Amino acid sequence: MSRYRGPRMKIIRRLGSLPGLTNKVLRSKPGYTDQLISNKKVSQYRIRLEEKQKLRFHYGLTERQLLKYVRIARKAKGSTGNVLLQLLEMRLDNVIFRLGMSSTIPGARQLVNHRHIMINDEMVDTPGYNCKPRDIITLKNISESRSGIPKGIDSSQRSRTPNHLVFDSSRGVGFVNQIIDREWISLKINELLVVEYYSRQA
């Protein structure tokens, strides 16, 4: 399954807030959501499926990519769900988003694909690059690249920068201090349901 490129509001109308996908706020009709819930008996499979979809759309992954991360997480020490979230959070496109260099993960991916991002003074054009502690992330040709950073995002996005990241706005430089803690993951997700969904595939 390829990466989703359709209307983003359609996705958050079905799955709820996904800050990595879009920063737009859905305005639902009064009683619309409650009516949908009351008229449908939701199966356990559907609940697990929707949690998986939240993860996939928030981080902008294909089905194959997400399954690959699940398989890696299963082989690692510790809780599979926690390891899975850590792997996704440490992707370069997500780290750029969490640093406040982009308002969405698709926007961050565009910065990477257009070769605006350097890690430890080396150009990186792979959005799925696995960031590590002590990595230094900078904007290549900062005067040009800054034009791609949305204005007004500093106060809102960067005020919520997780504790494993630091951003120096004066230099346009981000620092990775450590692997992210579960409590600093902004997405409202039950990762155990995602693991259960893939239990027969991974």
From Swiss-Prot:
An individual GO BP term: translation
Keyword RNA-binding found: yes
Quaternary structure and partners: Part of the 30S ribosomal subunit. Contacts protein S5. The interaction surface between S4 and S5 is involved in control of translational fidelity.
Family from the record: Belongs to the universal ribosomal protein uS4 family.
Source domain of life: Eukaryota
InterPro entries tied to this protein: Ribosomal_uS4, Ribosomal_uS4_bac-type, Ribosomal_uS4_CS, Ribosomal_uS4_N, S4_RNA-bd, S4_RNA-bd_sf
HAMAP family in the cross-refs: Ribosomal_uS4_B (MF_01306_B)
Domain named S4 RNA-binding: residues: 90-148
GO molecular function: rRNA binding; structural constituent of ribosome
Protein name as catalogued: Small ribosomal subunit protein uS4c
Alphabetical UniProt keywords: Chloroplast, Plastid, Ribonucleoprotein, Ribosomal protein, RNA-binding, rRNA-binding
PROSITE patterns: RIBOSOMAL_S4 (PS00632), S4 (PS50889)
Function: One of the primary rRNA binding proteins, it binds directly to 16S rRNA where it nucleates assembly of the body of the 30S subunit. With S5 and S12 plays an important role in translational accuracy.
Organism from which the protein derives: Haplomitrium hookeri
Keyword RNA-binding listed: yes
Gene3D superfamilies the record matches: Ribosomal Protein S4 Delta 41, Chain A, domain 1, RNA-binding S4 domain
Any Pfam family: Ribosomal_S4
SMART domains the record matches: Ribosomal_S4, S4
Cellular compartment(s): Plastid, Chloroplast
This protein's encoding gene: rps4
GO cellular component, one term: small ribosomal subunit
